[in-house]
């Protein structure tokens, strides 16, 4: 039997496999924190594994980023447990809202692996929950500290990001839980415009994020979610299982970041970009340098 054709075919397949670009594609959603985290992850891979990294940052909202990961357009991106639970898996939040962060993480980890062969790595260390924010002068004048107190006060001119209006853990459920009244329809806008709208008095109450850098730079008050409506939103890198298999040291490389970013640290990183207008890549590089001191 002439084995030459078989050997030639196997050789061609082997050469084709070897010629495939060995790279990791890092994605992110389309707001500052995600782009900063995408850069941190990308640079961590580059400096540790020394493999090429393609960046597909600023992809869009949650469902677009998730679909890109499932389809293999990207290899990994940072996600939040509460977002995965409610917006992606369509599961109800824990009855106690803020609930057990470890239980929510276990639920989304198991479901992602079972349904899509996606792996949740250990959390980065911070919890970016939604934050309902008013101007500081408003909170002081009306003696507001909680969402329940805001609900009893008066109807609110409200601003929110586009995704928050559509999410099961978003606007509609919040209004029902607190019997919060709005003055007209809430104004939808990009997340980066919320604080400007609040400062210019276009709106009086915004649905923002607890790790927003601008929150610490302005005179604002974050109203306490006293009915624990929002679930935990621990942030972690989610990766394709086949990508982790192709790069045996990738998981260890990324989990070296686990627990390294506190709420306050993430807020500061965001402020460096949004408040001081520094490039996300520069802020990410500076952060990584502090880890090796």
Put a short name on every predicted segment.
Residues 2-7:
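N-terminal export leaders
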Residues 16-17:
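C-terminal motif of bacterial Sec signal peptides marking the signal peptidase cleavage site
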Residues 21-34, 51-57, 154-160:
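Short, well-ordered beta-strand elements
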Residues 32-52, 172-176:
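Short, polar/charged alpha-helical segment
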Residues 54-67, 184-196:
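Short helix-initiation/N-cap motifs at beta->coil->alpha
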Residues 62-64, 68, 73, 78, ...:
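The structured alpha-helical core of multi-pass membrane proteins
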Residues 69-70, 150, 197-199:
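Hydrophobic residues within well-ordered alpha-helices
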Residues 81-176, 180-189, 204, 209-267, ...:
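Contiguous mixed-secondary-structure segments that line small-molecule binding/active-site clefts
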């Amino acid at each position: 039997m002439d084995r030459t054709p078989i050997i030639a075919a196997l050789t061609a397949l082997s050469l084709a496999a070897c010629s495939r670009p060995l790279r990791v594609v890092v994605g992110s959603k389309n707001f500052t924190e995600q782009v900063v985290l995408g850069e941190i992850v990308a640079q961590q891979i580059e400096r540790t594994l020394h493999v090429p990294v393609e960046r597909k940052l600023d992809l869009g909202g949650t469902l677009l980023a998730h679909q890109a990961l499932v389809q293999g357009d990207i290899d990994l991106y940072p996600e939040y447990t509460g977002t995965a639970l409610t917006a992606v898996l369509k599961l109800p939040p824990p009855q106690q809202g803020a609930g057990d962060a470890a239980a929510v993480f276990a639920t989304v980890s198991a479901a992602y692996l079972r349904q899509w062969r996606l792996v949740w790595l250990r959390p980065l260390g911070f919890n970016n929950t939604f934050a309902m924010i008013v101007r500081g002068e408003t909170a002081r004048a009306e003696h507001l500290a909680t969402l329940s107190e805001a609900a009893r006060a008066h109807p609110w001119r409200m601003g929110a990001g586009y995704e928050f209006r559509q999410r099961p853990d978003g606007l509609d459920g919040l209004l029902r839980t607190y019997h919060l009244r709005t003055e007209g329809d809430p104004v939808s806008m990009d997340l980066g415009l919320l604080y400007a709208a609040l400062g210019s008095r276009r709106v009086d109450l915004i649905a923002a994020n607890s790790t927003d850098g601008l929150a610490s730079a302005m005179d604002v008050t974050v109203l306490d979610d006293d009915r624990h409506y929002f679930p935990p939103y621990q942030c972690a890198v989610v990766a394709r299982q086949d990508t982790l298999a192709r790069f045996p040291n990738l998981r260890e490389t990324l989990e070296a970041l686990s627990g390294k970013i506190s709420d306050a640290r993430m807020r500061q990183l965001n402020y460096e970009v949004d408040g001081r207008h520094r490039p996300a890549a520069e802020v990410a590089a500076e952060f990584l340098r502090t880890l090796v001191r």
